[in-house]
C-alpha cells in the first residue's frame, strides 16, 4: 500500500520550497503590514531558516535548527493581522507557482497551528 503524499511532496519537494520562500519574502518585504519586522534581518539567513522550518512543518525532512516559534518571535508584539498577512503572502506565492487551491488550503491549515506560538498566546 502506498503511503499518502505529504504536503511538502504535493508542493514539489525541495526544489519547490527553494523557489517559494524567496518569492514569499519578496512579497512580505513589500507588505506594509509586516515588512518592518524584517528591517534589520539577514534575509539570506532568514530565507534558509524559513525554508527549513516550512519543509519540516509540511512533512519534509527536518533540518530546522532554529528556535521554537514562541522564542523566535518573543517581544515582537505580533498580532493576528500580522500572522494573517504572512499566510496571505504565502498563499499568493504558492498560487503564483501553480499550486492548487486544495494544497494551499492544506498547507494553511497546518501553518495555522503555529499561530498561538508565534503570537505568544
Curated annotation (Swiss-Prot):
One Pfam family per UniProt: Bac_globin
Protein name as it appears in the record: Group 1 truncated hemoglobin
Residues the entry annotates as binding heme: 73
UniProt source species: Tetrahymena pyriformis
Subunit structure and binding partners: Monomer.
Keywords for this protein: Acetylation, Heme, Iron, Metal-binding, Oxygen transport, Transport
Iron recorded as keyword: yes
Record GO terms (molecular function): heme binding; metal ion binding; oxygen binding; oxygen carrier activity
Family: Belongs to the truncated hemoglobin family. Group I subfamily.
PTM-bearing positions, type N-acetylmethionine: 1
